[in-house]
Regions:
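Mature-chain termini and adjacent capping regions
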Residues: 1-164
Length: 164
């Protein structure tokens, strides 16, 4: 039971900072389902949840083969989701569905940066971005891709006109 509480706490730290998340999601219960859990009750080290990982909180859904939470001096510093691919989806406050997939999704809490590595795709109503590496800076909202010798593909959708 104590291990389950630790896992819920660690995963909640991952989910609490997504910039465009539906704000009401943070106030809802979180459900975590997986085949296996291996958590440390210390201030330093890695804890993992593996096997058909499903994490849901409100409109946020995360699917992965494995989730690893890294703690340094008692604070969560990094969360790594891996899968074939790892997938995230969430509805924002405007009711728009946002999706992200990659072989590995790494969230650095200290720098508020998310790296999508390996077949990365971000889809949202305003457009999409695809590449081997996509970086998302939560503070600035900046998406960067490429620069590693691979190419990126982007699609920008026109702004919809308000109905009269």
């Amino acid at each position: 039971m104590r291990q389950k509480i630790v896992n819920i706490f660690l995963i909640s730290l991952l989910l609490s900072s997504f910039a465009e998340a539906k704000s009401s999601d943070r106030n809802q219960a979180m459900d975590i389902n997986a085949d296996h859990s291996d958590a440390l009750l210390t201030d330093d080290g890695d804890s993992s949840i593996s096997g058909n990982v499903l994490i849901s909180q409100g409109s946020l859904q995360i699917y992965a083969d494995k989730a690893v939470v890294t703690r340094v001096k008692g604070d969560t510093s990094k969360v790594t989701l891996s899968g074939n691919p790892a997938r995230m989806q969430q509805t924002n406050d405007n009711g728009e569905l946002m999706k992200a997939t990659a072989k590995q999704i790494v969230y650095f809490l200290n720098t508020e940066q998310i790296n999508l590595l390996g077949g990365a795709v971000i889809d949202q109503p305003r457009g999409s971005m695809r590449g081997e590496v996509i970086r998302y800076d939560i503070k600035s909202g900046r998406l960067t891709g490429g620069g590693d010798g691979s190419r990126i593909q982007m699609r920008l959708e026109p702004k919809t006109q308000a109905k009269k």
